[in-house]
């Protein structure tokens, strides 16, 4: 019997007993669609976990332990932009397992440092071969004897964990006509879509990606998604009609401005989701198709924008954008729609 299965860590970190998400209403004064009966709400992961990837990372390690892929002698390796890697590193550290995070050279140093600080069995490296992505590197290393790659970009435990833990808490707090989330692994959007489908809900799930050449931390461009992600996202989303996109500058700017509007300081991938949400709502207002999303109980469109983590791991990137030097540092513009196409 693999003793890791019965480790006390699993009981202590049971997501079903934690608060995983909080919901705040976006001020109507800052909502460009308030007069159209649209209520914009912000769902932020910071609750009793640092970020929403923690339950998913836990599920990935536990799934492999139960299946016997991870034993006390296994080295766990995972491609990560930071949050999943940090969560898996914490879990492996507690279990006494060696963990290697594969991270791109452009990952902020602050995100690398929180993994490095764990010390002990935890290490990180960049891809070693020319043209190799972090994901392909982790998959290659995971095939070695006594190594295992949980692979958040392919493992069904990723969307399943969001459907099992995040979705019930989210839908228990608010009606959700439209759910907008940054797309990194496609796991969050697939999990919410799966939950909605299984519960007979009409919720429209909108994944938001970076425009090509407009990278935002913890999100992907469509070309990178096609290269790395093996989860069957096409079962839920049409590439031509269901995806929204955003630019880097607008994503950083809108997340920065949101710190004055809600009691949370969410990171740049939230800004990307907010850009995508506003673009989505603008498109449907122009085409006269907003009514299809109205909730039967109150006739309102409840648009929920998801923020996976807060701003602190990206301090250096915010400073590099120098948002504090321009007019936006003095207040929030009256019309956010003027900002969502900025580059």
Summary of predicted features, one role per range:
Residues 1-343:
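PLP-dependent amino-acid enzyme catalytic core
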């Amino acid at each position: 019997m693999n003793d890791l299965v019965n480790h006390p860590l699993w009981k202590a970190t049971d997501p079903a007993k934690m608060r995983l998400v909080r919901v705040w209403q976006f001020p109507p004064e800052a909502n460009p669609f308030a007069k159209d009966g649209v209520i914009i709400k912000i769902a932020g992961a910071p609750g009793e976990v640092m970020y929403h990837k923690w339950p998913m990372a836990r599920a990935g390690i536990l799934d492999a332990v139960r299946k016997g892929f991870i034993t006390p002698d296994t080295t766990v390796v995972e491609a990560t932009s930071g949050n999943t890697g940090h969560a898996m590193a914490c879990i492996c550290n507690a279990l006494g397992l060696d963990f290697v995070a594969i991270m791109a050279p452009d990952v902020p140093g602050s995100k690398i440092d929180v993994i490095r600080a764990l010390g002990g069995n935890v290490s990180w490296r960049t891809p070693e071969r020319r043209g190799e992505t972090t994901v392909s590197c982790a998959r290659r290393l995971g095939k070695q004897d006594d190594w295992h790659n949980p692979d958040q970009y392919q493992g069904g435990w990723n969307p399943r964990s969001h459907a099992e833990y995040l979705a019930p808490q989210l839908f228990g707090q608010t009606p959700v006509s439209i759910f907008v989330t940054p797309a990194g692994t496609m796991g969050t959007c697939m999990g919410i879509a799966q939950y909605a489908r299984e519960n007979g809900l009409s919720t429209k799930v909108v994944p938001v990606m970076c425009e090509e050449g407009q990278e935002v931390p913890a999100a992907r461009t469509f070309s990178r998604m096609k290269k790395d992600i093996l989860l069957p996202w096409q079962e839920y989303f049409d590439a031509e009609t269901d995806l929204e996109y955003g630019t880097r500058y607008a994503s950083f700017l809108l997340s920065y401005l949101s710190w004055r509007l809600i009691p949370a300081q969410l990171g740049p991938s939230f800004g990307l989701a907010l850009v995508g949400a506003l673009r989505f709502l603008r498109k449907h207002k122009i085409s006269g198709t907003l009514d299809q999303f109205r909730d039967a109980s109150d006739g309102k469109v409840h648009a929920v924008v998801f923020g996976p983590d807060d701003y602190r791991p990206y301090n250096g990137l915010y400073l590099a954008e120098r948002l504090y030097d321009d007019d936006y540092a003095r207040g929030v513009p009256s019309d956010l729609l003027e900002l969502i196409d900025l580059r």
